Every structure is written in structure tokens, then in C-alpha cells.
Amino acid sequence: MLEFSQFDRRRYPTVPVREGYRQWLPSYETTVEDEMDVVLLAPLERVPWAAVERAADLGCGTGRTGAWLRKRGIARIDGIDLTPEMLAIARGRGIYERLGQADVAGTGLEDGAYDLVTTCLVDEHLRDLRPLYLEAARLLRPGGVHVLVGYHPHFIMTTGIPTHFDRATGEPVAIETYVHLLSDHVSAARAAGLSLGEMRERLVDDRWITLRPRWAPYRNHPVSFAMAWGKP
């Protein structure tokens, strides 16, 4: 893990994760783009989407990932998140079987109960990745898959942009952010007994530049990534 402060070019005031997402909630659904995370899910070939009977969505937020999973035909989805206000929105979608407030490293969900565990845009808020991967491995059935989608460390380090939002006043605010190299993920996942089956990266392209014109200088830089980890 690398401290984000050495790459920080914005120097926004920074708030803890739960408080940050509570404050971000009014504009969250309109400012987080599917291009960052959801578009990376469908291309994953090592995930047997049609065979998944039960999924756990860790750091489910407002239910964006859960909604995508439901559209893929996954009927039984449990979700956990740290922020009660986010969970209230997720609950209103009516797609989760169970929802609970918990940390991704200690969900309280059942051992070996899930074919799929998803963690999207969460890892950059964790100082240590190991507890997350250990928890995902605990939740998975043998043969299950943990899909992690993250903010690419290259983009964080190159741009100096943390996870952030604008308050209603227009003031930008950062949410506590850490930088994990891709090798950090490999080390943490292997220590948890998981094996990497597939990885995808999302580049800044025309679609992204239409959404974020200021990102034009970063064309063809990776902005996010997805990893599919299997449990033997």
C-alpha cells in the first residue's frame, strides 16, 4: 500500500469513508459512471454468470452492481455496506434478499454460501487488502469466484485524483483514498487461497472523454480494472 498523499495534486479536504459517502449521496447516482465499473463485468469470461445462484455484493452502495447482477438473472443477492444512507437507496431497489450495515472485512454473512462475491470501487478506501480477500474467500463456495473492480492505481498515481465529490456548495471533497499496486492484490488474494483467473482494464477512450472532457490528456491510460479470483 502506498499513501495517496505523495501523489495528491488536488489537496481537497478529506473525510472518512462513511461520512464521505453519506455526503455524496444526493449526487452519487448522477456522478458515478457505469464506464468506471459496471462495463467491466460482462466481458469477464471466467465468471459463469448464468450458473450463479447466490451472490454477495460487498460495499454494495446504492445497489448499482446488484441491479446489474439481477439483470443477469441472479435472483438471490445479499449486500453489505458501511453507510446506512446508501443502504436505504439499495433497499428501495427491491433487488436484494438481505442487506446489512457492515465492513467488507467482517460481513457477518455465512461461510461458503456464495457462488459469487463482488467488490466494486471499494479497495481504494482500504488501508490493507488482506482482510477483504480473506473475507471473500470465506464466503465463497468451492469453485466460486470473487470479482473485484477497482480504481486503477496507475490513474490515481498519474493524475493525483482521489475518489471525490462536490458538495451542493460546489466545494470538492475527497474520500479517504489509498493506492494499491496490482501486485498488492495478487499477494493478498494468494494469501487467502484464491487464484487469478482473469483480468480486464478499462482505458480512457472517446466515450470517457465525452463524459469527462478534462481527461483528454489521459487518453489510453487505464482508469479502472477488474479481476476474477477463483476459489479451488
Model regions and ranges:
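Conserved class I S-adenosyl-L-methionine
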Residues: 1-50, 64-68, 86, 145-172, 176, 209
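Core SAM-dependent methyltransferase catalytic element
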Residues: 212-232
